C-alpha cells in the first residue's frame, strides 16, 4: 500500500508464517517445495487515529474495484505527502483453491492507472496479465493464454474496451472471457471468499442461514449458550408487506437479483431492521423479520424479543456467530475492523478461542481483525508473527511493525502497555489546564 489515507510510503503487512513452531494449528503449512505457509489469524493494534482501520479500508476498496465498482468517494490519497507522486497503490497476495495470487492496482480519483494479476509461489511470479493506461488507452501484456485465435481476439477486445473506472478482472468475468481461467479463481475470491466487517456492518443474521438446517440450528444454539448472551435461539417471523415501509427502488433492486426464474433469498436493512426477502421463481415474495428468543428460567416458557430490544453488544455478537460457522465450514477469509466495538473485552478473546478450536489442517481459512483489547497479547493464545502494530510518525503517516521483530518475552501485554512496541496513545504527563 502507498499514498492512501494515512499511508504515505510503500508499506506492507504480512501474514506469511515465520519459522516459529508455536501453535502449529494456526498455520496453513506449505506442502510442496514452492508453496507458501500462511497464518490463519492476524491481530492489528494501534492507538486511535493511528491508521489501523485504514489498512482494512484499503483492502475493502481493492475488493470493490476488483468486483467492478470504482467508488470515487472512497479514493482518499495521503494529503500530507511531500512528493509529486499522486498515484495510490494497493496490492494483496492471497490463497484460494490451493493457488496463490498477487492482485493490485495503482489509481487516482480519476480511475485506474495500472492493474495486474500474477500467480505466485515462494520462488517465482507468473504473469496472468498486466494493464497500464496511457494517453493512447489500455496497454496489456498477458501470460500464457489458452485457446485458439478466436479466444485471443475476444480477450484483446475485452482488454482494450475496459474503461478506466472498471477493473479488467471484473470485465473479463462479466463478458465471459476465455483463455485466462485463473482470473475466474481470483475474481471468485474477491466476490465470495473475502468478507470484510466494519463496525456499521450487519451480516445476514443467524436465522437467515440456519432456518432449514437442523445441524446449523443446533450449532447456533450451542454458540449462543457458549457466549452467555441470555438468548436461547433466533427465529424468523413472517410479517405483512403493508407493515414494511419499503421504497420502490429497494424493492426493484431485490427483485432484479432473480436469475433465470429461480427462487432465492436475500437480506436487506429497512428502517434500521434486518429483514429477509424470499423471492419465488415467479417474482412473488415474502418478508421475514429476525427475532431473539429468551427463556424464562422460572416457568421455562419462551419470550420473543425484537432485536431492537437487545443491547448493541449482543447484536454485534449475533453478527459474529454466522462468521464463526462460515469459518468452520468453508475456506473463507474475514477482516474485521474493531472487533471489540460495543462488546465486553472477554468476548473478543472467546471469539478468537472459538475460532482456533475449530481449525483443521486441511482447510485454508483466515481471521484478521483490528482491536484495542490488550488481553489478547498472550503467547499462550497467539503467535508473535500474528500481531502487528500501527503507529503514526511525526510526518502524519502510518508505520507498521510486527511483534515478531521484537523477539518478545512472555508478558507481551505488559510490554505493550509500557510502550515497548509503540502503537499506544502518547499523552502529556502534565495536567490539563482548562
What would you call each of these model-derived segments?
Residues 1-64, 287, 291-430:
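Switch/communication elements of ASCE P-loop NTPase nucleotide-binding domains
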Residues 2, 202-309, 420, 430-434:
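Extended helical coiled-coil dimerization/tether regions that scaffold
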Residues 7-9, 97-101, 111, 123-125, ...:
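Short acidic/polar mixed-charge low-complexity motifs
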Residues 27-49, 53-112:
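Conserved P-loop NTP-binding catalytic core
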Residues 72-76, 271-274, 371-373:
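Short Pro/Gly-enriched beta-strand edge/turn motifs at strand-loop
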Residues 85-89, 108-113, 283-289, 383-385:
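A short, compositionally biased
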Residues 90-95, 117, 292-294:
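Short beta-strand segments that buttress and anchor functional surface loops
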Residues 102-257:
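Electropositive, glycine-dotted interaction segments
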Amino acid at each position: 500500500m502507498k499514498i492512501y489515507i494515512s499511508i504515505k510510503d510503500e508499506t506492507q503487512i504480512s501474514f506469511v508464517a515465520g519459522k516459529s513452531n508455536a501453535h502449529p494449528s494456526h498455520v496453513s503449512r506449505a506442502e510442496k517445495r514452492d508453496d507458501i505457509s500462511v497464518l490463519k489469524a492476524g491481530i492489528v493494534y494501534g492507538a486511535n487515529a493511528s491508521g489501523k482501520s485504514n489498512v482494512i479500508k484499503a483492502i475493502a476498496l481493492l475488493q470493490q474495484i476488483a468486483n467492478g465498482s470504482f467508488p470515487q468517494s472512497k479514493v482518499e490519497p495521503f494529503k500530507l505527502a511531500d512528493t509529486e507522486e499522486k498515484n495510490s497503490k494497493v496490492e494483496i497476495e492471497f490463497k484460494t483453491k490451493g493457488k496463490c495470487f498477487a492482485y493490485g492496482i495503482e489509481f487516482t480519483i480519476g480511475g485506474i492507472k495500472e492493474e495486474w494479476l500474477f500467480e505466485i509461489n515462494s520462488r517465482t511470479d507468473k504473469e496472468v496479465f498486466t494493464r497500464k493506461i496511457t494517453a493512447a488507452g489500455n496497454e496489456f501484456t498477458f501470460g500464457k493464454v489458452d485457446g485458439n485465435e478466436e479466444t485471443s481476439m475476444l480477450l484483446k477486445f475485452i482488454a482494450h474496451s475496459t474503461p478506466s473506472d472498471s477493473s479488467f478482472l471484473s470485465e473479463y468475468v462479466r463478458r465471459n472471457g476465455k483463455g485466462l481461467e485463473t482470473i475466474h479463481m481470483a475474481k471468485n475470491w474477491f466476490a465470495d471468499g473475502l468478507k470484510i466487517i466494519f463496525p456499521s456492518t450487519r451480516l445476514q443474521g443467524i436465522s437467515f442461514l440456519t432456518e432449514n438446517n437442523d445441524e446449523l440450528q443446533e450449532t447456533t444454539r450451542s454458540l449462543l449458550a457458549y457466549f452467555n448472551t441470555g438468548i436461547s435461539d433466533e427465529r424468523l417471523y413472517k410479517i405483512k408487506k403493508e407493515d414494511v415501509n419499503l421504497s420502490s427502488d429497494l424493492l426493484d433492486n431485490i427483485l432484479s437479483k432473480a436469475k433465470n426464474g429461480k427462487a432465492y433469498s436475500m437480506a436487506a436493512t429497512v428502517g434500521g431492521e434486518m429483514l429477509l426477502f424470499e423471492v419465488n421463481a415467479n417474482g412473488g415474495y415474502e418478508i421475514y423479520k429476525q427475532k431473539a428468543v429468551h427463556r424464562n428460567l422460572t416457568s421455562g416458557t419462551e419470550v420473543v424479543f425484537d432485536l431492537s430490544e437487545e443491547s448493541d453488544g449482543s447484536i454485534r455478537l449475533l453478527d459474529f456467530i454466522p462468521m464463526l460457522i462460515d469459518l468452520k465450514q468453508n475456506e473463507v477469509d474475514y477482516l474485521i475492523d474493531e472487533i471489540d466495538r460495543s462488546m465486553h473485552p472477554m468476548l473478543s478473546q472467546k471469539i478468537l478461542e472459538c475460532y482456533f478450536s475449530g481449525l483443521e489442517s486441511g482447510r485454508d481459512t483466515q481471521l484478521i481483525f483490528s482491536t484495542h483489547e490488550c488481553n489478547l497479547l498472550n503467547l499462550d493464545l497467539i503467535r508473535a508473527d500474528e500481531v502487528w502494530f500501527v503507529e503514526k510518525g511525526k510526518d502524519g503517516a502510518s508505520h507498521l511493525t510486527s511483534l515478531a521483530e521484537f523477539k518478545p518475552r512472555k508478558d507481551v501485554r505488559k510490554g505493550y502497555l509500557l510502550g515497548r512496541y509503540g502503537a499506544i496513545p502518547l499523552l502529556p504527563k502534565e495536567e490539563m489546564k482548562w
